């Protein structure tokens, strides 16, 4: 199997940091997870098991790695209350994305202790997201209506707050 999805989520059903935090964290990481998942598929990076999803979940519990269900390598990342308070105090999107990247990198390194994880390839995807200005945009479709002389370009823009 190949890696097809990279997620940064809160531990299911609750992270231990409160429902309000859990909901906002999920929405704030959505754009990054979508970007990483769309781009990791193009790389055709093989896994060492029957999973195609690398899920890094924040929690108050201890760090651990396990293969769960049929297709998921689940990495639980212990995050302290002080890290959460620092995160909540961040005002810029760039700071938040860098915090997400640091969590993902911790997850990759933890998973790599017991599984084959292409850390360098994943880190290149992080850099690609930075180089694009922390934006998740892509061309959806181009259509030419020759009889009207119109060229239509449809682009997707996914931010932490909306999807257009």
Language model segments and positions:
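Structural motif
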Residues: 160-164
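Short beta-strand elements that form the blades of beta-propeller/WD-repeat-like
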Residues: 148-157
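Eukaryotic low-complexity, non-globular regulatory regions
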Residues: 1-114, 119-120
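Structural signature of eukaryotic scaffold interfaces centered on beta-propeller domains
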Residues: 135-147
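Short linear interaction motifs
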Residues: 123-138
């Amino acid at each position: 199997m190949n890696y097809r999805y990279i997620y940064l989520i809160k531990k299911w059903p609750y992270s231990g940091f409160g429902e309000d935090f859990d909901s906002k964290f999920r929405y704030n990481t959505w754009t990054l997870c979508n970007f990483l998942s769309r781009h990791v598929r193009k790389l055709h990076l093989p896994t060492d098991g029957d999973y195609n999803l690398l899920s890094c979940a924040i929690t108050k519990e201890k760090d651990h790695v396990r293969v769960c269900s049929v297709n998921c390598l689940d990495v639980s990342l212990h995050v302290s209350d002080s890290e959460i308070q620092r995160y909540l105090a961040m005002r810029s999107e760039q700071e938040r994305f860098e915090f997400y990247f640091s969590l993902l990198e911790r997850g990759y390194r933890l998973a790599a202790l017991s599984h084959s994880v292409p850390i360098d390839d994943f880190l290149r995807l992080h850099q690609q997201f930075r180089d694009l200005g922390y934006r998740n945009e892509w061309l959806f479709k181009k259509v030419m209506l020759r009889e009207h002389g119109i060229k239509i370009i449809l682009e997707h823009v996914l931010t932490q707050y909306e999807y257009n």
